Regions:
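Catalytic zinc-binding patch centered on the HExxH motif and its immediate surroundings
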Residues: 65-92
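Non-catalytic architectural context of zinc metalloproteases
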Residues: 1-24
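Pan-zinc metallopeptidase signature
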Residues: 2-6, 186-229
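Post-HEXXH active-site segment of zinc metalloproteases
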Residues: 125-152
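Acidic helix-start/capping segments at beta-turn-to-alpha-helix junctions
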Residues: 20-29, 33-42, 49-72, 139
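Short helix/loop segments within enzyme catalytic domains
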Residues: 151-187
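Short pre-active-site segment immediately N-terminal to the catalytic Zn-binding motif
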Residues: 96-114, 147-148
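Active-site recognition of the HExxH zinc-binding catalytic motif
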Residues: 44, 113-126, 156-157
């Protein structure tokens, strides 16, 4: 599909400083998410504007299971999601505390990758790709819904990796943090996934690698790629 975001140029590096907090309380998680969202807004705004679209900021909320959102009740399976109804990104802050059990680096990088992905959905919403996705989804039924879902999700992750590649230095994505990024960026519909709606680990790895290197949404037109899992 054609969209001006693909020719809008690279995502810029920004002065991105996130607090080195332990992600075990709602207050700490909200502080971390707020700081990182600010980085995402400042980096993506000029790209979206160059695509000919007015930039609208997102919001981010650290919530727990059972919380009411503009897109319904936040459930156990949700982990994190973008809600187009209020341009809100919702995170299960208690789950991030569980990630701290795997190590502080793992918890922080998981949050960065997930937040960058969800903000990728915000970019899709702003530039009209989400409307295109809704149209494609409405043209099919049953399991055929999975293909447009995979393309949509892979693209959001790809946009996230374009930002992370551009901001590798300010986010210190080197050494153990870079290895943690590679692990998270490769995560997909591992067998036996109940629904193959986010793309295979191989597809996620390939799109992430291309975007991280290119630092540009030009590397992320998943809609014209050959069909894959």
């Amino acid at each position: 599909m054609r969209n001006r975001i693909y020719s809008a140029g690279q995502v810029p590096a920004v002065a991105c400083v996130v607090p080195d907090v332990v992600l075990r309380s709602q207050k700490a998680v909200q502080r971390y998410l707020n700081a990182f969202q600010d980085c995402l807004q400042r980096a993506w705004k000029p790209v979206v504007v160059r695509a000919g679209v007015r930039f609208r900021p997102s919001a981010v909320y650290a919530v727990r299971q059972g919380s009411k959102t503009a897109c319904g009740t936040f459930a156990e399976k949700d982990h994190a999601y973008y809600c187009p109804a209020d341009s809100g990104i919702y995170f299960d802050w208690e789950e991030l505390g569980q990630w701290e059990d795997y190590g502080h680096v793992a918890a922080q990088v998981y949050t960065l990758v997930t937040m960058a992905h969800e903000f990728g959905h915000h970019v899709q919403e702003l530039v009209g790709i989400s409307t295109y996705y809704d149209d494609r989804w409405g043209e099919v039924a049953g399991s055929a819904h999975l293909e447009p879902m995979r393309r949509h999700e892979l693209q959001a992750s790809c946009f996230g990796s374009a930002f992370l590649g551009a901001n590798q230095t300010p986010l210190d994505l080197y050494g153990a943090r870079y290895e943690a990024y590679l692990s998270e960026a490769s995560y997909g519909d591992h067998p036996p996934a109940t629904a193959r709606d986010h793309g295979s680990p191989q597809s996620n790895t390939e799109w992430a690698a291309a975007a991280f290197t290119a630092m540009s949404p030009a590397a992320c037109n998943t809609w014209v790629a050959p069909r894959a899992g």
